[in-house]
Every structure is written in structure tokens, then in C-alpha cells.
């Protein structure tokens, strides 16, 4: 079909009607050859389609068809009204595509034979005719929908989305409303209107906030009503649930006391639906965290426990980030036993997850499980040897075991080891801290800092190994940091080009 886009596919099909008289009764198949003036108009439409398919301008043929179809002197004007309307819709769809016709002008500019000097808007005219076709020929609704969502609508929506992303809210809203003239079935215009209202909400005065909150929620709720039963809009539905959850969460601070619990539940439900539609473990973890935050805002710890409890009861149904987030919620609002089980679930999936190892170490101290703490701290220091805090876990483990043994020799040995690692942590001349670990499809980015705890400037070379879940080294990268002044901090970034990176470690700094 060459340059035929979605809505022109229907136009091209229409040109084959004459050659295909035997069609199913439930197809969009209006008569377009009689009366005579209609047949001539249909022929002009076919010529316009052929011209467009050859990268030409279909405006002349489209105007010819429109003139024939609106000529008040044409014979048998009262016959085959539905065929006339459909063919006029085709002609206007041609004008709406890559033609030289203006968007605003006089009726003469569009080929109309009546009221030629009257001002006209091509979008408004097209919408009126398309509506007539939808009413007269319901079986052609899909065809008309394709006309409505042609290049002008797509272009207008793209400009609206760009304006929204650039913060040009007046322009974005005007373009979205313009797009709604042509098509009111796709949700995208309401996405723009909801996004614009949300941006206005962020900068609004206290007096204006309720208005913009209501506007944004109204538009985004409309998006869900339009899109939630159409799988092709899955991304739109997912993002709208997230936006509505964020709006609900943001409204909690200023909400009347009687409404806070209800608003929290509504926001959490949107985040829950976002989690259901999530495309990644990271998105699902974010949703769980947001749910926890809104319930924490209103002191609903029972609901928070239900969140991480649902994950804990089905750990294989979640990825390591969602499990880790649930463990953190259990740490904050539940019991150490619950948290430990979730961190163990993370480590069964990825034994090299630094955050899970560290959080598990803290949790085992709370549980007085010092024998279990030692192997966890050993795994942690193997990954992160130049963070003094990690060696403190060794000291805690040995001190705890010393307190609990009845064997005097073992008590002395444990105490000596505890003292050794405590001194090691205190004397360490630098501290490595990580601020970002972003594993992506074909690479992983790690950012961190090195704090010089010594008394003179130092330059460091940090060598980082990217690991898979089995501990295999997938890539090795290094960064030079410094010179770093005494008691100061230097930053570093390493980027490993590898697929399947799940963790990392670095070689000890000398």
C-alpha cells in the first residue's frame, strides 16, 4: 500500500469494492456507484488514493469529490444517503492526509459547493461527517476510527506530548483538545490533559491545589475508563495507575483527617494495579515501596504487613528487588524473623546481592543469631572489602559467640577475633561506598565514592568485577579516583559491557 497509513488502508480497500461484489453481510460495504453523481465522486476518491500512493497530492481529486457530493442541483440527492456520507468521509480523510489543503480556511478551500465563503475548520467538518457515517452505517465504525486517527491526529498528539514534556502546558492542552475534535476514543489526549493538570498542581498555590488535583484525577480516571479493557493500551493503563497513585499519595498531607485513610487505600490500589501490570521486577518493587509509603503516612501498619506478607507467602512469584523491598518493609514494620525470611529469599535468587547481605547482617544481630551472622558478613566483605562497617559485623559476630559459649578457650579466641576485626575497621584508611548499581540489558553502571580517612592525599585505582548470579565474572572495569585530599571524598563511575550482570565486587584497595 505504499504510503497508506492505518486509516488509508481503509481507503485503499474501498477502491476494490467494484471488483469484489460478493462480500459478507456484516462488512462495511456501502453502495458507492449510484446515483450517478455519487459514482463520479467515488471515482475521484479512487484517483486521489492512487495519487497519494504514488506520493502525489490528493487534494484536487478530494475537492472534486466533495464538490460533487455537496452540489445541491445533483439529481437524486435524496437517494443512497449513507453511500454519499461514506464517500464524503473518504474524501475528507484524503484531505486530512498529506495534501495541500489548509486546516483552516473557507468551505471553498475544501471543495464544498455551498456557502463557499463561510469560514471552516477541516477538523470540525471531518468530525461532523465522520459522526454521520458512524450513525448511518454502524458496521463502518472501525473504518471511521481509522480515518479519525490518521496522520493529522497522530501529528497533533505527538506535538501535544512533546509540549507536555517541555513544560509548555498551555500549548499541550490546546493541542490535546484539538486532537479530541478528530478522535475521542483513544485515551492519549486525556493523558496529556491529566499530565498538564498534574504539573500545574505541583506549582499551584494552596487555594488552587484542590482544583488541579480534581482535574488531573478526572482526566486520568477517564484514561482508565477508555483504555483498561483494551490490551493495546496496556502501557497507558499502567502509567495512569501510577500517576493516580502518586496523586493520591501527594494529597495525603493536606487531606482532612476523615479522608486520609480512604485516600491512602485508593492510592495503594492504584499502585497495586501498577504492580500487576509491571514489566519488570524494578517496577514491581517500586510499586510495593509506594504502597508501603502511603500506608505508613496514615499509620496503617496492618496493611503494610499484608503487602510484604503476600510476597513472603509466594517468594518464587517475585524478583529479587521486589523481595528486597518487602524485606525492608518487614524490617520497618514487622519482625526480624519476617525480614530475615525475605532476605533469605533474595539470597537464594542472587547470593551476591550486597543490599540483602547487609540487611540480613543487621537482622541477624537483632535476632542474636551470631553464628549465622559470621558467614553472611564473610560473604559481604568478600564483595565489599573496603567498607569498615562491613568488618564491624565480624566483630559483632565473634563478640556475640563469645558471650554465648561456655568454653573458656573458645571465649578467649572469639574475643580476640572480635577485637582484631574491630581494630581493622577502625584503622582502615579509606571507605568505599556505592551510590548506584544499574544493571541493564547489555551493560551495568556502578557509581560510588571513596572517602580518604587518612592524613595525606591519596589516589586510588578501583577494579570492579561484574558478576552473574553464579558468581562468574562477566566483565572487569577500573577507575582511577583522585588525588583525594585527606578527610575528603572522590567519586567514580564504571560501566561494564556485559549481559546478565546481577552483582559486582571489587578488589581490595591497598
Question: Model regions: which residues?
Answer:
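Register position in tetratricopeptide repeats
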Residues: 94, 165, 199-202, 243, ...
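Canonical tetratricopeptide repeat
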Residues: 83, 87-88, 94, 158, ...
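Short coil turns that delineate tetratricopeptide repeat
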Residues: 77-79, 138, 184, 228, ...
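Intrinsically disordered, low-complexity Pro/Gly/Ser/Thr-rich segments with frequent PxxP/GP/PP motifs
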Residues: 472-500
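TPR-adjacent "capping" and linker segments in tetratricopeptide-repeat scaffold/adaptor proteins
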Residues: 26-42, 76-78, 140-158, 231-234, ...
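Canonical positions in the second alpha-helix
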Residues: 72, 133, 178-179, 222-223, ...
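Start-of-helix register in tetratricopeptide repeats
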Residues: 42, 83, 154, 188, ...
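Short coil/linker segments at helix-helix boundaries
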Residues: 47-63, 93-170, 196-238, 248-269, ...
